[in-house]
Amino acid sequence: MKNIFVTLFLLVVTMSGFAQDKFQLSTHILDISKGQWAPNVLVQLEKKQNSSWIKVGENYTDQNGRIKDFLKMNTSNTGIYKLTFQVKPYFENQKMNSFYPFIEVVFEIKDNEHYHVPITLS
């Protein structure tokens, strides 16, 4: 009986994984001054086209300081991108001064692999 429950549980977990969209880009923020994740930080994603940046999306970090759902895997996402982390409001909420009003990270996606962009704050 126990084996049946374990098998059913594994089947449900496996099937729920297939039902979810897969994403090519994720990020997270660690606040090393506190030794914890940085939740509720606005992060904007832009793609370079010619000499301009085109907004692709934006999201807030979750309670674990993560965003897991930038750039769906089923499209061609090659190109140069920029993540802009709006950290000043995060520090203001912590009653701290911020040296950086925002942090920009520019990178290039060349294939269909998953890319993860972590940053640390202090």
For the regions a language model picked out, list residue spans one by one.
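Glycine-centered loop-to-beta-strand initiation motif
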Residues: T61-K72
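Beta-strand signatures of extracellular beta-sandwich domains
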Residues: L42-E46, K82-T84
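Short beta-strand and strand-turn-strand segments in soluble, beta-rich domains
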Residues: N50-V56, S98-F99
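Residue-level detector of high-confidence beta-strand sites
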Residues: N40, V56-E58, F70
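Beta-strand-rich domain onsets/edges
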Residues: F5-P39, K47, W53
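Surface-exposed coil/turn segments at beta-strand junctions on protein surfaces, enriched
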Residues: Q20, Y60-D62, S76-T78, S98, ...
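Feature of secretome-associated and extracellular-like proteins
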Residues: I80-S122
